[in-house]
Structure formats: structure tokens, C-alpha cells
Amino acid sequence: MTAISDRFETLKQNQECALIPFITAGDPDLETTAAALKILDSNGADIIELGIPYSDPLADGPVIQAAATRALQNGTKLESVLEMLKVTTPSLQAPIVLFTYYNSILHRGIDNFLEQVAAAGVAGLVVPDLPLEEAAGLLKPATERGIDLILLIAPTSSSERIEAIARSSQGFIYLVSVTGVTGMRSQVEGRVLDLLQKVRQVTDKPLGVGFGISQPAQATQVRDWGADAAIVGSAFVQRLATGTPAEGLSAIAEFCQSLKAAIKTS
């Protein structure tokens, strides 16, 4: 059983929904990123998603795009992120999932990339622009190294595609709550419930909902609809980038606690 599967199994036994915060590596710097990972880990995060800054982030909304731009301007590179993780992950309880684009993987070579991320203690990968037809080439070598390849299902995915993705995805399945990019929205769209029900009919794997969740009430809503995890990105990235690094770290600690409290079953 992988670290992510093990975490979901424990949560299931406790009838708990997972909280998965997202932050961008290197914004404002890697020292703050390491501190943020530890703070999220100790304030309610069950799994943590770490975005690798990329120059052409097609799936990211304005908040995360701006964070990636700042990180790249600071000289953040995948190799330096992995060096930071190698030192940081041994002290974390929450498994780390890297959010990275496919070109970054191909540029380094799949085997070389996976060796590096495995050595850094990474538990899973989300690759938003990975075509399902090419997923097998990454899935097999990742699985051999104990790394879960987490695939995405969008509201526009056909029934056939949903079944294929559900079969292949490891760790959990990432349900995209909206058509479009990441970002904060005032409410979770009702069709998320339809998507959850549709996917649940074909798999018993954990289902995480992301893209657009920014408030505790929204996290509670997706939990009540049957999601196994609430994934929150832009709202964390924005808080971490506000004020000094110390103020940002304090803000994400408080926010993480409020989200976890909101999705804990009474």
C-alpha cells in the first residue's frame, strides 16, 4: 500500500474527509516553502500538493500563475525543490504530491525524473496536461517506485473516459470541479455532485475535488456530497503571499485549521 492509499484508508476508518492544501514551491522562497509544508502538516493537512513553477501553466488561474512567476524569477528550479524536499519530507506525516507539467518530466526523461522525485520522498504526481493515451508510459515506472500517478476527471469527460481514468488513476482520483483554470469561486457548482455520483458508480477509489474550493463552507459541501478529499489551492497561495513570510505562514496555519474543522464529521 502506498503512502497516499494508507492515508486514505486511515481516514476512511475514522470516517474523515481529507484536506489537501496546495502551495507553489519557491514563492516567496524555498525556505518559506519548507516552513509552510511543516506548518500545513501540523495544522490539519492530510496530504499536501506542491506545485512546481512552470512558465506556461495552462491549468492555473491568475493567483497560482502569479506565484509561479515570482518563484521562477527567484530562480526556483525542480532540482532545488527536490533538494529541499529531501531534507523536509522525513519530518512530515502528510504525503507530498507534486503538481507538475508533462514537459518538465519529458525534458528530464521519465526514469531520471522518477528517480529524483522518489529520492526526495515524493508520494504522488498530478500532471494536468498528461494525455490519458500517454499515461501508461508514466504509470508503470511510477508504480514500480511506489509513486502514485493521480489522474484528473473533468465535468466534460465522457463516460468511457471516466471509466478509463478511474481504472488507471492511483492513490485517488482528482475531480476538477469546473471547466477552466484553478482559482477561487463564490460557490461550488452543482454539477460537481453529478460528477461525484457518476464517478462513484464506476470506482471505489478515493475521490478528491479541487479547482475552485476556497472557503470552509465549500469544503463542507463537497464532503457532504460524498467527496473523500477537498483540495484547496489558490486560497492558500494567496494567503501565503500576503504580507511578510511570517505573516503568510501564520495565515495559512489558521486557514488550514478552519478548513479541517469544517470537514471533520461531528
Curated annotation (Swiss-Prot):
<feature type="active site" description="Proton acceptor">
    <location>
        <position position="49"/>
    </location>
</feature>
<dbReference type="InterPro" id="IPR002028">
    <property type="entry name" value="Trp_synthase_suA"/>
</dbReference>
<keyword id="KW-0822">Tryptophan biosynthesis</keyword>
<protein>
    <recommendedName>
        <fullName>Tryptophan synthase alpha chain</fullName>
        <ecNumber>4.2.1.20</ecNumber>
    </recommendedName>
</protein>
<dbReference type="InterPro" id="IPR011060">
    <property type="entry name" value="RibuloseP-bd_barrel"/>
</dbReference>
<keyword id="KW-0456">Lyase</keyword>
<dbReference type="InterPro" id="IPR018204">
    <property type="entry name" value="Trp_synthase_alpha_AS"/>
</dbReference>
<keyword id="KW-0057">Aromatic amino acid biosynthesis</keyword>
<comment type="similarity">
    <text>Belongs to the TrpA family.</text>
</comment>
<comment type="subunit">
    <text>Tetramer of two alpha and two beta chains.</text>
</comment>
<keyword id="KW-0028">Amino-acid biosynthesis</keyword>
<dbReference type="InterPro" id="IPR013785">
    <property type="entry name" value="Aldolase_TIM"/>
</dbReference>
<dbReference type="GO" id="GO:0005829">
    <property type="term" value="C:cytosol"/>
</dbReference>
<dbReference type="GO" id="GO:0004834">
    <property type="term" value="F:tryptophan synthase activity"/>
</dbReference>
<comment type="pathway">
    <text>Amino-acid biosynthesis; L-tryptophan biosynthesis; L-tryptophan from chorismate: step 5/5.</text>
</comment>
<feature type="active site" description="Proton acceptor">
    <location>
        <position position="60"/>
    </location>
</feature>
<comment type="function">
    <text>The alpha subunit is responsible for the aldol cleavage of indoleglycerol phosphate to indole and glyceraldehyde 3-phosphate.</text>
</comment>
<dbReference type="Pfam" id="PF00290">
    <property type="entry name" value="Trp_syntA"/>
</dbReference>
